[in-house]
Swiss-Prot record:
GO MF, any single term: glucokinase activity
Purpose: Catalyzes the ADP-dependent phosphorylation of D-glucose to D-glucose 6-phosphate and glucosamine to glucosamine 6-phosphate.
Subunit (UniProt): Monomer.
Name of the molecule in the record: ADP-dependent glucose/glucosamine kinase
Gene behind the chain: glkA
UniProt subcellular location: Cytoplasm
Lineage of the species this protein comes from: Archaea, Methanobacteriati, Methanobacteriota, Thermococci, Thermococcales
EC identifiers of the protein: 2.7.1.-, 2.7.1.147
Length: 467
């Protein structure tokens, strides 16, 4: 072993400090970011054992427990709602089921929430990039009722509105409309949380989604008709929310109708040389997933985790590699990233998992690694505080320990790749960046961590490379 574990930890500490300063100085260079398409209201409830047991007992424990073993993956009754929550606890897995029944929607509303936050990947990133990083940010809101608009923080966050025939950019609070409240009910539980004999192996959340607009990737008229004008105000775009698409809708439209519009937006972004990042999220429908993979060549960058990367390998036709990626083998992950780049020609792939991040790029530079380190700090700070208000708060995460298990992985990478230094691997026509992340022992909240990681890395890397 060339260096002791202590030496490596010291090295990463130094790299983290430098990366934070570099990102802090570079972020003001970013002149504008566009975020689309999913914004909603997150109603967060921290589950209480007694309350949950009482509700399960009232509705019928046997019926609810049956749902745990045979999940419908959608909610049309209260027992399905409670069964879904218990299944998520039992497996320690994040799950999201759509609420089809009005009766359950009323029940959810009456059950209430502990706090409201802006939700949806675009909405969460808007409060971070515009509110915390102070980057001028244009965000798509399918609906903009008062309850949602007030969840946007102050700062350079804008929604486009038509005044007569002119498109204006105003803060969401100045564009409130009598529109629908799109609520995602999020039930959070800590590691070890127990209800009856069901115990959570790790902290996570169950989402009951009562939102008909984002479920079909509804696009506002301003985005349908004024997209080119919006594009002129930005250098970067982050697209998310397409994972919910269904093959067919009751009104006769299909996922293709939505993706054709997305593709026309990407063509405009590319014409204006706007760099675009696609936040891939697990897409249940195979045909939709195939179509999303086909769209990747139009993007500059994609962000994903092991479940999403494996699901793409299945589409590409490498079942064996998909399995190995799910099992968490780092070399399989690297192979899969290379396969994805070969297949799509995409310039940048950002992989995030518990403990480490990787970025495979068709260009070189320490900025790629520094952006990953900054993203790790931002995620740790958000996990510690539950919410970020100022970019300076991210500095506090420097004191969070770096994941030592990932530092051991670094040794394996060194053995495999001769050209490996300070987390950077030269792969002839590509560069691979590896960073061990900061792990917060008991996070205040897990909502929006993935969005924080991807958007922080994408914008800070762009800012640093622009200097």
């Amino acid at each position: 072993m060339k260096e002791s574990l202590k030496d490596r930890i010291r090295l990463w500490k130094r790299l983290y400090v430098n990366a934070f300063e570099n990102a802090l100085n570079a972020i003001p260079n970013v002149k504008g970011v566009l975020l689309a398409y999913n914004t909603n209201i997150d109603a967060i409830k921290y589950l209480d054992k007694d309350d949950l047991e009482k509700r399960v007992t009232e509705i019928g424990k046997e019926k609810v427990f049956e749902i745990i073993e045979n999940p419908p993956e959608k909610i049309s009754s209260i027992e399905e709602l409670l069964g879904g929550i218990l299944r998520s606890i039992k497996l320690g897995k994040a799950m999201e089921w759509f609420v089809e029944s009005e009766e359950v929607r009323r029940y959810l509303r009456e059950w209430g929430w502990d706090e409201l936050r802006i939700g949806g990947q675009a909405g969460i990133m808007a409060n971070l990039l515009g509110g915390v990083y102070r980057i001028p940010t244009i965000v798509h809101v399918p609906q903009n009722p008062k309850l949602q608009a007030e969840l946007f923080v102050d700062g350079p966050i804008y929604v486009p509105v038509f005044e007569g025939n002119k498109l204006k950019l105003v803060h969401p609070k100045d564009a409130i409309a009598e529109e629908e409240e799109l609520i995602h009910y999020i039930y959070e539980f800590p590691r070890g949380f127990q209800v009856f004999d069901v115990q959570a192996p790790r902290e996570n959340r169950f989402i009951a989604n009562a939102d008909d607009y984002n479920a079909r990737v509804y696009m506002r008229r301003e985005f349908r008709e004024g997209f080119e004008e919006i594009t002129r105000n930005v250098e970067l775009a982050i697209i998310s929310g397409l994972q919910v698409l269904k093959e067919y809708y009751p009104d006769g439209t299909t996922y293709r109708d939505v993706l054709d519009r997305v593709e026309s937006h990407l063509n405009i972004l590319n014409r204006y040389n706007v760099k675009s990042h696609f936040e891939f999220a697990y897409t249940a429908n195979r045909r939709v997933r195939e179509a999303l993979v086909e769209l990747l060549p139009k993007f500059t960058s994609v962000g994903l985790n092991e479940v999403e990367l494996a699901s793409i390998m299945e589409i590409i036709g490498d079942e064996e590699l998909a399995k190995e990626v799910l099992e968490g083998h780092i070399f399989s992950v690297i192979d899969a990233m290379n396969v994805l780049m070969d297949e799509t020609g995409i310039e940048r792939i950002h992989f995030h998992t518990y403990g480490y991040y990787l970025a495979l790029t068709q260009y070189r530079g320490e900025e790629v690694r520094d952006a990953l380190l900054f993203a790790s700090l931002a995620a740790a700070a958000k996990a510690m505080k539950g919410n970020l208000e100022r970019i300076e708060q991210i500095r506090d995460a420097l004191s969070v320990p770096t994941n030592e298990r990932a530092i051991v992985l670094e040794e394996e990478l060194e053995k495999e790749f001769t050209e490996f230094e300070n987390g950077l691997i030269d792969m002839v026509d590509r560069q691979l960046a590896f960073v061990p992340t900061k792990i917060v022992a008991s996070p205040k909240s897990t909502v929006g961590i993935g969005d924080t990681i991807s958007s922080s890395a994408f914008v800070s890397e762009f800012g640093m490379r622009k200097r």
